[in-house]
Design a protein with these regions (language model features):
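N-terminal "arm"/small-domain region of PLP-dependent enzymes with the aminotransferase-like
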Residues: 1-34, 401
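Glycine-/small-residue-rich active-site loops that bind phosphorylated ligands and cofactors
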Residues: 17, 100, 123-124, 152, ...
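Phosphate-binding glycine-rich loop
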Residues: 37-93, 107, 117-119, 186
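PLP-dependent aminotransferase class I/II
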Residues: 42-46, 51-57, 130, 134, ...
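PLP-dependent aminotransferase-like
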Residues: 76-150, 154-166, 170-175, 182
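Structural detector of well-ordered beta-strand residues that form the stable sheet scaffold
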Residues: 95, 116, 171-172, 196, ...
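Conserved active-site segment immediately N-terminal to the catalytic lysine
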Residues: 173-207, 236-241
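Active-site PLP attachment segment
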Residues: 190-228, 251-256
Length: 423
């Protein structure tokens, strides 16, 4: 069968609009509530808190803003108020998911902390509890863990929380990618001490931008709300007694989120159907899909991902910004598949490049299940060496077109394109 390029691009994940969004945006404009207060903001804060299962929600300009204020709050709770012109994490280490987008990590740097990256495990591709326990052995004074749920798949939360509780550490939950996912029947975004979600344009629910901080503490919610409005004091004039930020969500962005929220379950179901069609369509190929804990979790299936078996990988070499490969019959690699998808006007993406491999963070500590991942032979490394799980998944994996508006017929063509790479 001859495959022709798609006339209309098949996206990785683009917004899925329904029309309700326009209603609430128009209302904001018609009533002149277009700034950072209004009925849309009030509504989405109530709706998200109810959906996720927390008492309070604070609407913010983006998920990164939520993560920043969550990290700042955790730092103040553990270490107290910082000195003037210093972050709350000055001189402190924070354990952080390694295979993630850098928005998970950057807020640690905003607060002058040092991220210690924790390797992934193969069951969910998330933070490895074994590596986390190793990290506490090596950095026993660390008291904050930044945990992300990769591609909408919940991490092994109970194991991670038990380790954190043992060491007196707080969890900042980065649920930016996992709104609608559940772990043991609880929504992600409600599991940590401080919780954050994102409404970026590619997320399962979007406001074009936007994010939210979630908590069961009114005191914490009030603190984050104050910080997000430039830390204005309750005074007759503009009074500021601590550093603040312009992190507020606009009532227009909130209108888009408000129109999206009734469709959360529908979006999750569509994403799951995409995942299942890929899984069925790849039968017989030397590949696996991004895994999850079937017994304890239900992902939101935000992005469907593919992992090529080790013995089915052709030669692939990656530099800082480019990649080369040599095609071999019966074998392929992420670079070849992504190039072929692009040729047919479909968008894929490499797996998140692990943070310990990023140029900006190459001097930060990195801990694997065997110990220090920066030193391949020392007292912390077992005799069989150090396995870098995240680097391996990055080398052999890719994100597939996962757009809700992709039809089953279009997805079947995507599957055929990928199958052809193994010929």
């Amino acid at each position: 069968m001859e495959i022709k390029p798609f006339e209309k691009k098949i996206w990785l994940a683009s917004p899925t609009m329904h029309g309700d969004e326009q209603k609430w945006v128009d209302e904001a404009i018609q009533t002149n509530w277009v700034s950072t207060v209004g009925a849309n903001i009030n509504s989405v804060e109530e709706d998200i808190a109810k959906t996720v299962g927390t008492k309070y929600a604070v609407a913010l300009s983006c998920g990164t803003a939520a993560l920043h204020l969550a990290v700042k709050l955790a730092g103040e709770r553990i270490y107290g108020m910082p000195k003037p012109n210093e972050g709350t994490l000055k001189g402190k280490t924070i354990f952080c998911t390694d295979m993630t987008f850098d928005a998970t990590v950057n807020p640690i740097a905003y607060e002058d902390g040092e991220a210690v990256f924790i390797d992934s495990e193969r069951d969910t591709w998330n933070m490895d509890p074994v590596a986390l326990e190793r990290a506490f052995d090596m950095y026993p004074d660390t008291k904050i863990v930044m945990l992300a749920h990769l591609y909408g798949t919940p991490a092994k939360f109970d194991e991670i929380k038990a380790i954190c509780d043992k060491h007196g550490a707080l969890i900042v939950e980065d649920a930016a990618e996992s709104l609608g996912a559940t772990y043991k029947s609880k929504q992600t975004g409600s599991l940590g001490d401080y919780n954050c979600i994102s409404f970026n344009g590619n997320k399962i629910i979007t406001g074009s931008s936007g994010g939210m901080f979630l908590t069961n503490s009114k005191e914490d919610a009030d603190k984050v709300r104050k910080w997000s409005t430039q830390s204005r004091e309750d005074a007759a004039w503009y009074q500021h007694e601590e550093i603040g930020y312009n992190y507020r969500m606009s009532n227009i962005v909130a209108g888009v989120v408000r129109g999206q929220m009734p469709y959360l379950s529908e979006h999750v179901s569509a994403k799951k159907a995409i995942y299942e069609r890929y899984k069925e369509g790849f039968k017989g190929l030397p590949v696996t899909m991004n895994p999850y804990d079937v017994a304890n979790s239900e992902p939101n299936f935000w992005l469907s991902c593919l992992l090529i078996n080790e013995d089915a990988m052709c030669k692939q070499v990656r530099g800082e910004k480019d990649a080369l490969y040599i095609h071999e019959q019966g074998k392929t690699c992420p670079t070849e598949i992504l190039e072929k998808l692009a040729k047919y006007n479909a968008e894929g993406r490499p797996i998140w490049k692990p943070m310990h491999m990023q140029p900006i963070y190459r001097t930060n500590p990195f801990i694997t299940a065997q110990g220090n991942g920066r030193a391949r032979s020392n007292a912390y490394i077992a005799e069989n060496g150090c396995e870098d799980v995240g680097a391996d998944i990055f080398q052999r994996g890719l994100c597939l077109p996962s757009d809700n508006k992709m039809t089953a017929e279009e997805q079947e063509i995507i599957i055929q394109i990928i199958r052809s790479c193994f010929e």
